[in-house]
């Protein structure tokens, strides 16, 4: 809000009000991020607990239990592979997401340039831009570009579980939980 007020060359009284609004917005965003991180961490732990309970129900996998608790030897190669694969998945999804944002931004830039070229009067404020087209580009790009990260997030645990087994999947879930929570905490936005 403050930046818009400054670009519009509004008076200092307006800027004073928008600075307060910016401050409230930034505080709200920081609090919401904390809640999002906390809920994601609890959800990941709940999924890991559900995995452990399913192990307990499966007679073929009860060898992973000691006194009713899931126990995994961290020195086993399959478990180590699972941990490393799990620790890399949040970074892979993050990379795909950043690439998706970049592609969507370039599509938006091309559309805005096209509108400046083809719609007379936009720069002077007499012509009306096609806002709906920009919203349409954003929506379609978001859906299209986020499919691959979604497939990785859903498919990776299945692939690890079926190809490497339950012990590797336990390591995978531990790795993805630890690195995912840390990535969420230390990512700037």
Curated annotation (Swiss-Prot):
GO terms for biological process: sodium ion transport. The keyword Protein biosynthesis does not apply. The keyword Transmembrane applies. It holds the Pfam family H_PPase. GO terms for molecular function: diphosphate hydrolysis-driven proton transmembrane transporter activity; inorganic diphosphate phosphatase activity. GO terms for cellular component: plasma membrane. It is an enzyme of class 7 (translocase). It catalyses: Na(+)(in) + diphosphate + H2O = Na(+)(out) + 2 phosphate + H(+). Its EC number is 7.2.3.1. The record marks 29 as: Determinant of potassium dependence. Requires K(+) for maximal activity. It is found in: Cell inner membrane. The chain crosses the membrane at residues 31-51, 78-98, 146-166, 168-188. Disulfide bonds: none annotated. Keywords: Cell inner membrane, Cell membrane, Ion transport, Magnesium, Membrane, Potassium, Sodium, Sodium transport, Translocase, Transmembrane, Transmembrane helix, Transport. Its cofactor is Mg(2+). It is a multi-pass membrane protein. Belongs to the H(+)-translocating pyrophosphatase (TC 3.A.10) family. K(+)-stimulated subfamily. Homodimer. Sodium pump that utilizes the energy of pyrophosphate hydrolysis as the driving force for Na(+) movement across the membrane. This is Putative K(+)-stimulated pyrophosphate-energized sodium pump. The gene is hppA.
């Amino acid at each position: 809000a403050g930046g818009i007020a400054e670009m519009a060359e509004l008076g200092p009284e307006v800027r004073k009000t928008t600075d307060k609004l910016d401050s409230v917005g930034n505080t709200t965003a920081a609090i919401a991020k904390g809640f999002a991180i906390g809920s994601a961490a609890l959800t990941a732990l709940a999924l890991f607990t559900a995995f452990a309970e399913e192990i307990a129900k499966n007679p073929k996998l009860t060898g992973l239990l000691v006194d009713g608790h899931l126990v995994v030897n961290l020195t086993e190669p399959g478990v180590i592979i699972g941990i490393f694969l799990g620790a890399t998945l949040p970074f892979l999804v993050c990379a795909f997401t950043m690439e998706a944002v970049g592609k969507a931004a370039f599509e938006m830039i091309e559309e805005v340039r096209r509108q400046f070229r083809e719609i007379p009067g936009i720069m002077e404020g007499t012509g009306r831009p096609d806002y709906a087209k920009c919203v349409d580009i954003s929506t379609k790009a978001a859906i299209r570009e986020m499919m691959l990260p979604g497939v990785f997030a859903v498919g990776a645990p299945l692939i690890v579980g079926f190809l490497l087994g339950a012990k590797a999947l336990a390591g995978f879930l531990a790795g993805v939980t630890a690195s995912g929570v840390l990535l969420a905490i230390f990512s700037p936005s």
